[in-house]
A protein has these predicted regions:
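GAF sensory domains
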Residues: 108-111, 119-125
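A short, polar/charged loop-to-alpha-helix boundary motif
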Residues: 80-91, 146-155
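Short solvent-exposed loop/turn micro-motifs enriched in small/polar/acidic residues
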Residues: 55-57, 99-100, 119-121, 163
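A short, hydrophobic, proline-anchored segment that marks a local hinge/packing element in signaling
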Residues: 121-131, 140
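Regulatory sensory and allosteric helical modules in signal-transduction proteins
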Residues: 67-74, 86-111
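Long, charge-dense accessory insertions within large macromolecular proteins
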Residues: 2-86
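Mobile "lid/hinge" segments at catalytic clefts and subdomain interfaces of large enzymes
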Residues: 134-167
Length: 167
């Protein structure tokens, strides 16, 4: 990843609002709903996966990122994947118009040059819109896949000359 792109993806986002127009009970209900969505998404991914890396070692995570690329909620799982989710999603947000995001879209990424951690960590994310078509948040799932193809089994090749031979 270029230094410039890395700087943009990791840059601090605008501060969160310091005032709220909703009461604390409603805010806690929303927080609980976000937490449940993340927990159930990560749990379902673990149950549905055939890879022991995902279903036994739990190298997976789910998160919700707001429309500005800020982490809104993360599930219990592998902590570093929560932050890689954010980076991949931020890259998607930077290129949103290029890919014509819309309701029902789902994106998959694993490229370290575009926000990913390393090739075996796949990020699947989809935008969530309100009834007016405004982007509210992005639901993300990330998991480590044992083999991504490439020159050597396992996705790690010491003599890889490019991303394609690495896998």
């Amino acid at each position: 990843m270029s230094f410039e792109l890395n700087r943009k993806l990791a840059a601090k986002r605008d501060p969160l609002p310091t005032t709220a127009s909703i009461d604390s009970v409603t805010a806690d209900i929303i927080r609980g709903a976000f937490e449940t969505v993340c927990f159930e998404s990560a749990t379902f991914l673990g149950r549905a996966a055939s890879s022991p890396i995902i279903n036994s070692s739990n190298e997976r995570n789910a998160a919700i990122v707001d429309a500005h690329g800020r982490l809104a909620m993360g599930a219990v799982g592998t902590p570093h994947l929560t932050f890689v989710n954010q980076m991949e999603t931020r890259w998607g947000l930077m290129n949103q118009e290029r890919y014509d995001w819309g309701p029902g879209d789902v994106f998959v990424g694993n490229d370290p040059d575009h926000g990913g951690g390393h090739l075996p960590d796949y990020c699947v994310y989809g935008p969530v819109y309100d009834d007016k078509g405004e982007l509210i948040c992005i639901q993300t799932l990330q998991a480590h896949q044992g083999d991504t193809g490439g020159k050597d089994a396992g996705g790690f090749s010491l003599d890889a000359v490019d991303i394609f031979t690495e896998g």
